[in-house]
Amino acid sequence: MNIKWEISESDIQKITDFVNQHKNPFVENRIERNIYRRNINIDKDSVLRCMLMCLLTTQQRSGPDSLISVFLRQNPFPLTYTIISHVEDVEDYVRWVLQNNSLNRYINKIPAFFATNLSYLEDTKWLLLLNIESLLEDRVTKQTERIVADSIDQSFKGFGSKQARNFLQALGLT
């Protein structure tokens, strides 16, 4: 059996119009980073922000107008590496920042996971940065992505395989 597709100019125009009507800045940004590999910034701050995003969004609403999204878009962001590296008790500070932004769900677990994960990053001298930067290479395989995601899943407290994949996707690496 052979199937012959005939696509007219009007078909193409209908699809183009549909896509243009449903454009979304979030989706456009993801396409720019994850497909075209542009505007990807991998550093300690982006890792910490993405880690926190994954911890916050595990079981909470996180649409574009949610408290989580508003918090994560703050500029300057209140939980940069420069700030938290000078804080005596990271867990308490993260809890305080989250509470001041009305992010009270799992208010004990999330700061504890964040502090533990930061300690892991520090103890390993941020080896994770090298591992995830390797995903910026041109010829990355799905197997390499899976190895890095599995490493994140096993290393970060409060993470599972879904959070590990979301983490890499949010950074623009998958």
Predicted feature residues:
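Structure-specific DNA junction-binding interface
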Residues: 1-112
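C-terminal extensions
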Residues: 2-12, 129-136, 146, 172-174
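Short helix-capping/linker segments at secondary-structure and domain boundaries
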Residues: 58-68, 121-129, 173
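Short acidic/histidine-centered micro-motifs embedded in hydrophobic/aromatic stretches
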Residues: 70-74, 117, 170
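Alpha-helical ds-nucleic-acid-binding substructure associated with the helix-hairpin-helix region
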Residues: 77-157
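Phosphate-backbone recognition surface of nucleic-acid-processing proteins
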Residues: 155-157, 166-174
